[in-house]
Amino acid sequence: MDSNTVSSFQVDCFLWHVRKRFADQELGDAPFLDRLRRDQKSLKGRGSTLGLNIETATRAGKQIVEQILEEESDEALKMTIASVPASRYLTDMTLDEISRDWFMLMPKQKVTGSLCIRMDQAIMDKNIILKANFSVIFERLETLILLRAFTEEGAVVGEISPLPSLPGHTNEDVKNAIGVLIGGLKWNDNTVRVSETLQRFAWRSSHENGRPSFPPKQKRKMARTIEPEV
């Protein structure tokens, strides 16, 4: 196993522990708590994949971070912060919408890259809106936290989420996943639109009414249902 992979996991575990202690003091805002929950799932998945114990990794990560801090000067810290572009966290969904339980009568699932797409293909003739929580950098989507499809009644009928065991995805990965989700939902004559926030940062080629316009390859796929569950 690559040593950088192990040390990266160890540092991530310790930094999550620090953030959790911060949240336990009721100091974190909604986006902070949202990321904390998502990162916890990601760390559990990575730990399982790597065969590493999270508690042991957290202790090792603490030693690594302490060593770095001992060697870090205030001036170097200022230069590092100034050189890193700041990302913004955008929320379409409330905490209730993020944590809302849902089940599928006709479950379908597809994995594309490091993203998992799930939907209920029993849903028919509904008006559906896609909402997402994600970070933005340079006016483009940086990291998808969670995307969900809601009916007008507020029911969750679809979802795109990062796979904990496969961290990392691009803006194009997210766009492709959105296309697959919309294609599956439209199969049963549902009307699907994308939130204004998603249109602006993740789906730039959209019509004014919020219904996305697909590239030719994606349009051909629209006539097919989503692939069988994996």
Curated annotation (Swiss-Prot):
Region (Disordered): 205-230
Any one annotated GO CC term: host cell nucleus
InterPro entries: NS1, NS1A, NS1A_effect_dom-like_sf, uS15_NS1_RNA-bd_sf
Superkingdom of the organism of origin: Viruses
Start and end residues of each stretch annotated as CPSF4-binding: 180-215
Cellular localisation: Host nucleus; Host cytoplasm
Chain's role: Inhibits post-transcriptional processing of cellular pre-mRNA, by binding and inhibiting two cellular proteins that are required for the 3'-end processing of cellular pre-mRNAs: the 30 kDa cleavage and polyadenylation specificity factor/CPSF4 and the poly(A)-binding protein 2/PABPN1. In turn, unprocessed 3' end pre-mRNAs accumulate in the host nucleus and are no longer exported to the cytoplasm. Cellular protein synthesis is thereby shut off very early after virus infection.
Subunit structure: Homodimer. Interacts with host TRIM25 (via coiled coil); this interaction specifically inhibits TRIM25 multimerization and TRIM25-mediated RIGI CARD ubiquitination. Interacts with human EIF2AK2/PKR, CPSF4, IVNS1ABP and PABPN1.
HAMAP family: INFV_NS1
Name this protein carries in UniProt: Non-structural protein 1
Organism: Influenza A virus (strain A/Equine/Tennessee/5/1986 H3N8)
